[in-house]
Regions:
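Outer-membrane beta-barrel architecture
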Residues: 14-16, 27, 50, 142-144, ...
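Structured alpha-helical segments in the cores of large, soluble enzyme domains
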Residues: 7, 11-17, 264-274
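Transmembrane beta-strand segments that form the barrel wall of outer-membrane beta-barrel proteins
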Residues: 28-34, 280-292, 327-329
Length: 384
């Protein structure tokens, strides 16, 4: 009797056009999902636009995607006091018709109407008065271009950026048994983020006689930040039904974080082969990471590999069709986490009698930390 009929709708419209020099496409979609629980629904909106153009040796491609998602309540599932079905099956039983408690207030915003006044909550009260809502927006964009300098040489650039914003609110009214605070509760958080990744490549691929070579040189810029803040009431709400930080009985609890990182890179690769028998690959990369101290911020890591198809050089017995020798030497390095070398106090608010505390980490890291590094070697063979 508590569950409702769920349904999903999906609507989409799209437009596209193709011409002599390029194409264009755009689409808009909306998904609505009505769940089986009261006050359970999800909306998703997606809009995308993109296209490409080509003028002789020059070509471009780009586009953007926007996603929006919002719902009024993400609670109600699972085992425990906040689970609707758990409350109904374990603690209610068949002696009660839950529909008799659809009006879940005895006293508006202060006392819920339920057959159990000690342990668990009215499922209708949970669905409407103990909620966790979210509103999320994200944009993805990309752009790339390529120019064919010569038949065997080209230059390309690519860039992509992502941005998001999210807002979450949690609340429970007074008289909650299984909520966050029986005297009322309100929580709000906001977070935003952005990332960018762009690179430029000069690539070549050429053959002459028995030899073939290809490779590239390029550079990349990666940037990222994330900013978040959250606050919640403490020890209840001073005004029933008023969900605001201003209604907190005691001073609110708050926390915030900010993360930022940038990595600049240059790299290259050279590959050569002779008669499709002998192969050599050499790669090299140098990164500069903002998470490392200035003295060790730049780090270089190369790799070399090669192989020889012996069955192309030597006469093989009848039972051996293919034989290859291979070897490789590789160095990989990676930077540290954000703030690993810039430690700060850990602050807690309203710890005792309204006072805050600040604790410094017990482990102090060196200011000349280097990136993590790993070296690997490989020698092998393959035959059949």
């Amino acid at each position: 009797n508590f569950l409702e009929t769920g349904f999903i709708t999906n609507n989409n419209i799209s437009i596209s056009q193709t011409g002599k020099y390029g194409s264009f496409r755009s689409s808009l979609s909306h998904v609505y999902n009505k769940g089986q629980y009261p006050n359970q629904r999800l909306n998703k909106i997606t809009y995308s636009v993109g296209g490409d153009m080509k003028f002789g040796k020059l070509s471009f491609e780009g586009g953007a995607i926007y996603n929006k998602r919002f719902y009024p309540n993400g609670e109600g599932a699972g085992y425990g006091g906040g689970g609707y079905i758990y409350n109904l099956l374990v603690w209610t039983g068949t002696d009660y018709d839950v529909r008799d408690y659809k009006n879940y207030w005895r006293k508006k915003d202060e006392e819920q109407n339920w057959m159990n006044d000690v342990w668990y909550d009215n499922p209708y009260y949970l669905a409407h008065e103990m909620t966790s809502s979210n509103d999320y927006d994200k944009v993805n964009t990309y752009l790339s271009g390529k120019y064919d300098i010569m038949p065997w040489l080209n230059f390309s650039m690519r860039a992509g950026a992502d941005a998001y914003a999210s807002r979450t609110e949690k609340k429970n009214a007074m008289s909650a048994r299984g909520g966050w605070d029986k005297n009322g509760y309100f929580y709000t958080s906001k977070s935003t983020g952005f990332s960018f990744n762009g690179d430029a490549l000069l690539s070549a691929n050429h053959s002459f006689g028995d030899f073939a070579i290809d490779g590239f040189v390029g550079g990349t810029i990666y940037y990222y930040y994330d900013d978040a803040i959250s606050s919640n009431t403490r020890n209840g709400l001073s005004i029933p039904g008023y969900y605001s930080l201003k209604a907190s009985v005691d001073p609110i609890a708050s926390s915030s974080s900010y993360k930022q990182k940038q990595v600049n890179s240059i790299y290259g690769k050279f590959s050569a082969s002779w008669k499709s028998t002998v192969f050599v690959d050499v790669t090299a990369r140098n990164d500069w990471s903002s998470t490392l101290p200035s003295e060790t911020r730049s780090y270089f890591y190369p790799a070399v590999s090669g192989s020889i198809i012996m069955s192309q050089l030597l006469k093989m017995p009848e039972w051996l069709n293919f034989w290859k020798l291979r070897g490789a030497w590789t160095v990989t390095k990676s930077d540290l986490g954000i703030y690993d070398t810039n430690q700060a106090y850990s602050v807690s608010t309203n710890v005792w009698d309204g006072m805050n505390t600040a604790v410094y980490p017990e482990m102090i890291r060196s200011t000349t930390l280097e990136p993590t590094a790993a070296r690997s070697y490989e020698i092998g063979t393959a035959f059949n």
